[in-house]
Design a protein with these regions (language model features):
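Non-catalytic cap/lid and distal C-terminal segments of serine-dependent acyl enzymes
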Residues: 3-7, 13-243
């Protein structure tokens, strides 16, 4: 083994310089000043493993659309069952819209979890609902006021977005579900009966136990009814698919 004297100190200094440079780039006098697609890997306490996020920041260039003035809003954007944290950047114009409408977009990785706590699986619900906002708020100096924070997703991600927003109504101004699985009880019954080839009954049982029955807090239809008369409930919009 070859030992390089001073190697550890050099690496440490380099990491500090990179960290300071990134934080200066992300925030100058409290305002985001770069356009960036940040991809990061970090250890999650809730997941008990390393996971990935993508984060888009609006920029100051005028090549596509002028920069929107004011404090950027924050959108947590969730992927579907067969996707991952790269889904939105690969298959949509999300970076363009982030700049046009002045959003910081945070896209986490959740595998095929349905954003559940998991009876025998991994606690993706508390990771996305609680740990991820705390980490990103600290790293990127986000304005995390309720009126500045939104969540959305498609398919499985639409279900996750609604479930998270309605279980944390104090955190989100609005939630959008694109072809989201909102009749989640009906969906789990269909999968348990073997009537959907894209998911096995065993996956549902790993979320909800042998009976495969979701609890009330995991059922968007129950949550919508529960919060119907709450004046402080998040605004909700559901887009249906064409299939």
């Amino acid at each position: 083994m070859i030992r390089m004297e001073g190697q550890s100190n050099s690496i440490a200094i380099m990491c500090v310089v990179i960290n300071v440079t990134l934080m200066y780039s992300f925030q100058i006098k409290g305002k985001i000043k770069i356009m960036g697609l940040f991809t990061g890997n970090f250890y999650s306490k809730n997941l008990r493993m390393t996971t990935q996020i993508n984060v888009i920041f609006p920029d100051v260039s005028n090549d596509v659309t002028p920069l929107y003035e004011g404090t950027p809003k924050v959108l947590y954007l969730l992927h579907g069952l067969s996707g991952n944290s790269d889904e939105w950047t690969r298959f949509s114009k999300i970076e363009y819209y982030a700049k046009k409408y002045n959003f910081i977009i945070i896209m986490p990785e959740v595998q095929r979890s349905f954003y559940t706590t998991g009876k025998v699986g991994i606690d993706y619900f508390h990771y996305v609902a609680d740990e991820l906002p705390a980490i990103c708020g600290k790293w990127f100096h986000l304005d995390q006021r309720r009126e500045n924070t939104f969540i959305a997703g498609e398919s499985m991600g639409g279900y996750g977005a609604v479930k998270i927003a309605l279980n944390r109504p104090e955190k989100y101004e609005a939630v959008a579900s694109l072809s989201g699985v909102l009749d989640y009880v009906g969906f789990t019954e269909m999968v348990l009966a073997g009537n959907w080839e894209d998911m096995s009954p065993q996956e549902i049982q790993s979320f909800h136990g042998e009976a495969g029955k979701p609890e009330e807090w995991e059922n968007p239809l129950f949550l919508v009814e529960k919060l119907a008369k709450d004046e402080n409930r998040p605004r909700l919009i559901q887009f249906c698919g064409t299939e």
